[in-house]
Amino acid sequence: MYNSAVKKGRCGEHGRKGRKERMNKGNQLYEGKAKKVFETENPEYLIVSYKDDATAFNGLKKGTIAGKGVINNQMSNRLMQLLEKNGVPTHFVEELNERETVVKRVKIVPLEVIIRNISAGSFAKHYGVEEGIVFPEPTIEFSYKNDELGDPLLNAYHAQALGLVTKEETETIKKYAFKVNDTA
């Protein structure tokens, strides 16, 4: 078991307040390509532990990169702090150590949200346009996070029909996605 001090609710260098409580790393809930997620004795919080595993081509190629988990943890936490500073809510609570972070338990929406300002990559290929075209307004794309299906592209109506999100959640996702793009 891993013991750590965690502030209840909001904490850290963001001016967050709350009482400290002890938290133990409990049962593993999930293991993916890049991280493991553990429950804590407080049902509102989880501990994310970043791995050194590396994958490519939807997991077909695998390897290990020493220190990758540490870098991913640091980058993720700095990004979450930047987003919160700019009015985008996140699940970040507190960095425990170089590899682990306490996060709020949230509903996982199995969508990848892509904002494009310029035609590139799969967009250019899919629509048969030249790379590098600057769009007059950013575009938004969604893909269904499902390795077995190859993360297919879908629109908001598809996501709602599949029960992945509600109409209200779709609007919230779009609002914050464009806000993140403006922050960059």
Indicate residue ranges for each PLM-predicted region:
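Short, positively charged and aromatic/hydrophobic N-terminal segments
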Residues: 1-3, 10, 19
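Short linear sequence motifs
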Residues: 7, 22-23
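Active-site loop/lid in soluble adenylation, ligation, and acyl-transfer enzymes
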Residues: 24-143
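ATP-dependent phospho-/nucleotidyl transfer catalytic cores
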Residues: 102-104, 124-183
